[in-house]
Amino acid sequence: MGITMFKEFKALLSFFTRIPIYVEDFDFENIANYFYLIILIGYVFGIFSLILGYIFSFLLPNFLSAVLILFFIEYLNGFHHIDGLIDFGDGWMAVGDKRKKLMAMKDRYIGCGGVVFAIFFNLMAVISLSYILDINILYLLVGEVCAKLGMLSCSTFGNPLIEGTGRYFVKKADEKFLTIGIILSLPLLLIFSGIERKIVIIAIITTIITGLCMAKIAKRHFGGVNGDVLGASNEITRVVVLLSIIASIKVFSIYLLG
């Protein structure tokens, strides 16, 4: 990793987490040139969740452990992605054309759509995490890396809105960025073997498709992708990936028993 790349990675880490990192000359245009490094931030979140998982699951029941893991993950990113999910839900459920939906997504009030989205996806995340703790705790790492890959996928397939900091990332992201992101995700395969490795491959494919779907939904409802959509992509992708892992395990179990 070159000096410039390391500098921009520090800036990305500072922007997407609450980790106190000194960054001089914070420039979104420059940071966006290395947006694919967000996958490495996914590893940071994943390792953090693994540490929490080992500690809490030793002391508490899985459900309570899952609640605490999700809370501290969201705290580490400053609750920005949940905020994006709430705004995304408000905008999606708003009645009217793209302009009205975008206004609903950007206003400072929380509507019913945002509340329901936040409750539903966080509840699904907690339940899924509690199952994962019972199956294989290493899938926590997969979930966080894939959540960031989902953001990159959404950026790649989406078109940027005019306003907001998210436009810098969406404008720069392309197929090359996504390819690098996928390559950076492949080390996940090294910590699994056999059927579990196939499940991780399914999770990565599911992630890319989820990001594509988020980009298409954003274009239809808002005209493009902004920071709120990217934040929502992170939260929704995590849930979809964890569900795909749980479902794949069940399908493979039935296949093997049959």
From Swiss-Prot:
The keyword GTP-binding does not apply. One of its GO terms (molecular function) is adenosylcobinamide-GDP ribazoletransferase activity. It is found in: Cell membrane. Its EC number is 2.7.8.26. Its main location: membrane. It holds the Pfam family CobS. GO terms for biological process: cobalamin biosynthetic process. One of its GO terms (cellular component) is plasma membrane. The chain crosses the membrane at residues 35-55, 56-76, 113-133, 137-157, 175-195, 198-218, 238-258. Pathway: Cofactor biosynthesis; adenosylcobalamin biosynthesis; adenosylcobalamin from cob(II)yrinate a,c-diamide: step 7/7. Its cofactor is Mg(2+). NCBIfam families: cobS. Belongs to the CobS family. This is Adenosylcobinamide-GDP ribazoletransferase.
